[in-house]
Amino acid sequence: MPQARYDFDARKPYRSNIPRPAQLLGYEAGDTHSTYREQEKTLLAIAAAAKDRVRVFEIGVSVEGRPLRLFAVSSPENLAKLDALRASNLKLSDPRTQSRAEADKTAKSAPAFVWINHCIHGDESASFESAMWLLYTLAASDTPEIKSTLANSVVLINPVFNPDGHERFTVYNNSLALGIAEGDTLELRQPWGVSGRYNHFRFDMNRDKISQSQPETQAESAAFLAWKPQVFVDQHGQVENYFFPPNSDPVNREADGKHIEDWTSVFGKANAAAFDRYGWQYVTRERFDLYYPGYLDSWTTLSGAIGMTYETDEGGRLAKKRSDGSLITLRDGIAHHFEAALATIIAAAKNRERLLSDYVQYRRSALTNAETDPMKRVVILPGTDPERLGALALRLQRSGIEVSVTASAFTSEKAHPYLTHGGKPAVQKQSFPAGSLVIELAQPQGRLAKTLLEPTTPLSDAFLKAQFAKRLSNLKKNDAEQTDDYDFYDITAWSLPFAFDLAAFWTEDTTPPKTQSLVAPIKPTLLPENALPPAYLISYDRENAAILALRLLEKGYRVGSMTKPGKAGGITLERGSFVVRSERNPESLHKVLRQLATELGVPLIPLSSAYTDEASVGLGSEFLKSLKRPRIAVVADDMVSLTGYGSVWHFLERELGVKFTPIRLRSLRGETLSTFNVVIFPEGFGYSGALGKPGVDALREWVAGGGALIGLASGGTWFTEKDANLTAATLVGADKEPKPEDKDKPKTPEEREKEREKKPTSLPGALFRARLNREHFLGFGYGQEELVFPLMGDIFLKPTTKGTNAVTFAKSNLLVSGFAWEGNTERLLAETAAVIDEPTGAGHVLLYLSDPTFRNLWRGLNRLLINGILFGPSRTYGDE
């Protein structure tokens, strides 16, 4: 028999002065998709009518300017002293501020803080709708259960994490005929530019917690740290059957497996009981892990909360037929999220005292673990790029991690370098200069700090054993058999010192160095006196030097760059450094240059003379090359990964501050191409087929005329395809045409295994040791040849024979961080290419095996891409 229609008004009696969402909206839950403004109107009206139970906090704005709010709901008694309760909870979160006895006393009387996060993915619409019914029920219901729950908890409701994505989705869907449950309906196929899952910049907001790159993430993180809840639920959709924890493996070691298993079982059983009352189906311990700290559930768990992902089984459309023919609706998906949220809140309130006590213990364990763990702290050398060091510090601070800086030099007796050369990591005596960053792991956020900073976060032996067993089984299967998927849900490496390309050590010394708190961005600058010199030198010892050059070019000023080292007026001109000559620029140069240099923290060195005593290369040399203003096109629309496009968009607009033109693939033809001198292909698929021979030929001709063709990840590896032939590089393990006599010959399991071992097994995402050619323009600005390079997937590149392999993987000891397949990955990856430049006529084909802009995560690779954009259109073969 079909189930009865779910009743959202089952928790009677309700306070009559609180308006129902349906009364404010003009329709019932699930009848249509609500817009942001409709939700905003509804929530604020409920809050205004229930001021004794609800307070509203403005926590930020989205990229497109939509307000982000947090609604705090509790009993009238608690709400009257909410500020004091929050202060007490923050004190509870820092075991250094009170004794165990004081913490135990607080835990006996304090409410539990429970955060319910809605609509992080904008097209997972059941979560967005359920927020209104959750707030209404908590604000209006007068049942003993709800009143008792509010007396023992403070509920924090974030009604929409990603309003910009949700608005795109809603406006598109509401403009169509909706509600058809059959088949592959139009509403399921959002146009490329809509895809409401992502925010304005098409970032996946549930992968942004490490980078903290988007304003929505930053606002939510700051609010979380201002409240420090004990429970955090992140609502998602849509899966076949509703999911709530316990999680599958792997679980991040710093999450404390037993602690998280105990509490996710408590909440899982509470959710199960609520669902069982209605006969609803659900799953646990499948697919959704708790390993990658970029997820909301992992990040909040590592911060001390019980962080959980809930996945509902409908939303995104009004109705669908399941595989067995039964019907499920948006209203059902809303109801499932609504009931799970209430069950979790009620369970937290009932278990309030133990929950608070265990929360304190988890936070305290970060301090006590550091006493016995050899890894006491992480020290990061200042290097030559203070802005990059400051950006890393800010990233940590946005995660609530305490960061300090050394005021004077100090020495560690037991320091472990992050990068070593063969064998086990060395333990050495190491001196550190003033200005080094220090992150003590003995701090309340120490567990999160450790997983973000440690060289690699281990996976359990049991999990690894299961993956290797699957691989062995897959190798032996015949071509008709289905292979097993591996259980990696996301990347396995993210260590921030590697990601930022900063030299780092972890130390064992029990006595910490003397430091001072870091409260301001690290951005010193050096400006010359008011005199107007004949030229300015901008040393390329920091990333922002290249950004300064780009912005000057963007504004129409003339900038040169040294292709070989030289001297002028007694000052060394390093390879790649920038020279801005006054007499070749308008008078406004001096003011604009000083403003930009101050903003970006870039020293300006005045050059009073072009004369050189010691070298043949000076300001008048042919090796000082004028740079062309990059006129950038980024391929967009179908075939292009939205997140790949979005990360490039964000990088160009927000990181570099330069303009670009999105261009459709089919528009890449002669007249349109001639407008640009840089074309970037983000990650995507099917490019050569979509372009066809005329399109590829037009692209090749454009490159030969001086264009820089940049391909990122799969947006570049298609250059190797037979139909493209834009590079001489080929793929490792590429299939060869079998001999005619072998075509129909059956293979033994051993032969199949041997053949498959010649191909890379797909990587979930790890970091590998690589070598950089610093004499090539792509290597300008780097202070060392050794580089850490990320890689995922099963595409490895053989070196090109017709250009420069600007970055190549090391010969041995390749794996630096994360997971690789023993006996396969390093054997096939050794000495292959990571970044290739193939001069073609007057232009360049630049192929990056991985995307430096991925999730705004690999900050240390930025210069590789900046150099391609900045120097690619200005370098002809032989300049290097």
Each model region followed by its residue ranges:
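Aromatic- and acidic-residue-enriched carbohydrate-binding clefts of CAZyme catalytic domains
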Residues: 185-203, 739, 744
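Short, conserved secondary-structure transition motifs
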Residues: 150-169
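Aromatic- and acidic-residue-enriched segments that line the glycan-binding/catalytic groove
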Residues: 167-183
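Short, solvent-exposed turn/loop segments enriched in Gly/Ser/Thr/Pro and often Arg
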Residues: 159-163, 173, 235-241, 715-716
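Intrinsic-disorder/low-complexity accessory segments
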Residues: 1-125, 129, 133-154, 201, ...
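Structured alpha-helical segments in the cores of large, soluble enzyme domains
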Residues: 100-104, 183-195, 220, 231-235, ...
